[in-house]
């Protein structure tokens, strides 16, 4: 639709058109409808609410390496594409409102739905939806500070997710599927349990871990652009999220396991990956 109305595909040419230098009449509606479709496609791929319905079932049913890939790679590439499209062209109040709504809806649904999950991968799926909501705060602001906080947020989210799925891959060897199966982890593999706990605390945004820095920058950007309600929803959903993250830690360290599972040691590659990402999550505090 955009190409049919403008005859251009180069970002510089589209920037002039989208900022109004060469836009007239009915062509304007068609162009902005095309931009809206790009935004919806992007929100679908990053699993933002209300385009998230496919994510929990796909995350649960896919092999763990595929789930890890879907949790990280598409989000990084799509956020990069959104940045290119909307930084070169006119951002537009309508698109800001779309990201504003999707950000709030994703944070709320991600926090509330994750509380009811009993399976590890489904919990991580809804956690991912919630974090997409936090990251979308950067687009909702429409400011340089918002974009900077978004870049920090997606970088830290990627590291935390790599860390979490490296642990899930290690647990896959013993066919751990339910949260209740983690009851014996602290007793049979305390190092892995401590590492998983650090990752969950970082997801929850507990200082001084990297997840706290990510949310701090995003909420600060929201306050800076006057989006006080957005920042309030983010803080409240972060507090709610602490419940299900800390529930995992409680399960690993304090609950009696329903079945005793012998966890096999991780191989060298996963151990190195886990050590590097965990170190960054723990020590990142600018």
Show where each model-derived region lies.
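Alpha-helical transmembrane segments of multi-pass membrane proteins predominantly involved
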Residues: 1-286
